[in-house]
Each structure stands twice: as C-alpha cells, then as structure tokens.
Amino acid sequence: MPVISIWRGCVLMASCGITFCSMGQIDPFSRELIQVGYNLALQGHPPLSGYAFYYLNKPNFFNTNLTLRLAVAPTYMDSELGISHALSEYTDLGIGLAGGGFADNYAEIRQGRYLQGESFTGYGGEVSLSIYHLFNPASKIPLNGVIRGIAHYSTYSRDDRTAPDFALAKDHGTFSVRTGLRWGGREPTLFPSLAMELSAWYEGSFRTENETYGFGDRKLEPQSHLLWGAALLAYTLPEWKHSFYLSLTAGTSVEADRFSTYRLGALLPMVAEYPLSLPGYYYQEISAKDFGLLGLNYIIPLDEKQRWNFNGTLTTAVVSYLPGLEQPGNSHTGVGVTSNRVSGANSVSTSR
C-alpha cells in the first residue's frame, strides 16, 4: 500500500474518536482513560477505521471552578476549558480548541464500494464557545440545555489515489451553531452500568464556499441544517451483573451535502457522542438525509472483576439516502460481537 494511504488509515484511527470530547455539560468527575477501537471488514477493501486516543478530564484545574477536558491522538487534539458558574449559579461556560492533521478526510463509498479516486485528505482546526445551563437543580434527573458556536476551517489535498481529473472541494470555513435539551444522560464510558436519556438537538452549518467539485457533479451547500433526537436506557441486572443498553436515534436534514449528512456504519462505540453504529458495514458507508436507528447491546462479564466483557450488538436502521449515494433497499440490519476490556475494545462484526 502506498505511503499516503497508510497514513490516511492510521490517522483515521487516531482522530475519528476525538468527538468523544464534545459533551452536553461539564463533567464533574476526574477521568483518565486510553481508548482504542478498530473496525475490521471481513470482505472488500474499505478505508481503515478506528480510534486511539488518550482522554483526560480534570476538575479543579488551577482553580476550583475550572475543568480541563482533553483528548489527544497522534496527529490531533481536542480540548475544552469548562468554567463552572461563569454566567450564573447554574450556567457554565466552555471554551474549546481542536485541530490537527487528517481530521477532515473524506472517503467516498457508493453502493458498498470504496472509491479511492473520489476520496481525498483533509486537515482542520476549530474554536468553540459553549453555554451549559441546568434547568432543574433540585431534581434527581437533570435537564440540561446547551448552546454551542463553532468556527471551523478545512483544507484539502490529494492523496496518491485521487483521480487526476477529480477537482477537490475548495478550502473553506464553516460556522456552526448547535443547541439542544438533554434530560438525563450517560457517563463517557464504553457501556455505562446505569443511564437514561431523552434529548433533542439542532445544528446549523454555514460555509464560506458553495462551489461544485468532483467531476462537476457535487456541490458544497452554503448552509445545512440537522435535527435529531435520541433516547437510551442502560441497566445492570444486580444478581447476574449482565447489562443491556438500548438506544434509539432518529434525524432529518435540510440541504445536507456529503460533508454534513448523517453517515452510518461500523461498530465504533466511542467514535462520537451519538455514534451511528451499524456493524457489518464499512465506517460511514451509508449517507442518509433522514434516518431512524435502533440498537441493542447485551454485555456479559467474563471475570469476577469485570475487566473483560462479552458484548453482543444488534442494530437496525431505516434510511432515506442522500441523492447520488443510494443503495438497494431502505433498511439495513447488522449484528456485532465484541470483547471489551476496561482500557479499550477489540471488536469483530459479522457481515450484514
């Protein structure tokens, strides 16, 4: 495999899980983790996909009202400084900085085929400002509101297999706003023992460029709008110590393009705050403008201290495709088998 292709795959492993750092409120607990995950395709030739990063959450960072959240991969870094009670007793502020190499790579996958001639390398950096508000401080189940503004800049370059006549998307800035309500929530761990959540979100993205690219057949939309909701329930049976994790995520979009649409596929549970997992498929294989995704995980401990666990995953999705990236049928189902260790996960997924 040529050198640039190797680097693209290796850095995807490093960077695609960094959105783990983007949470809905300031985490009050001290955490220091190493997360490793890899998605192996048993057939075909997809782009390598996975993540490897060091995660730190440090309350009382130089001051009692400061919390540092940091995720570091070999070529990418994502961080946020949380300031508790910055605007009021129950309103916090977060200042974020992220960036590095290969973070904005784009892999074209159409009809289940990875098209390297239409794929390219991307680099990016961003700053963000977030406001977190707790609406019901006296309640056992918190209701949090989030408003986040993001300024992101992306640059693109060819790799060794990009087609010579394929025009790259122009370097551009993207200004985004995300807002949402979350009732409940989950700890930022692989599979929490107890959790519940109901949440609703909106994200609008506004770009500085809206030119065509590729073979003149695709376009950067000047603005895109995403709306989605999520529900989850996690519980551990007290006698058996078996756990289940049930989740439902659904979303729609307006004027989405290849860079802003929902992309489903693979089994990488720490790849995002709301991972669109579909085991047995390539990472981000399915591009959907609308979707519904139902997932069930059942976790069985393999030793008394629960350092090793067996995890079975079943997910099913109904999608409406982004134009130009359609696949046969509008429903997809995947089954996955994973062995998990406290410090990471090695996973093998069955074919669809």
Give the role of each language-model region.
Residues 42-44, 60, 76-78, 91, ...:
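Gram-negative outer-membrane beta-barrel proteins
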Residues 130-177, 182-189, 193-195:
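Intrinsically disordered, low-complexity linker/loop segments enriched in Gly/Pro
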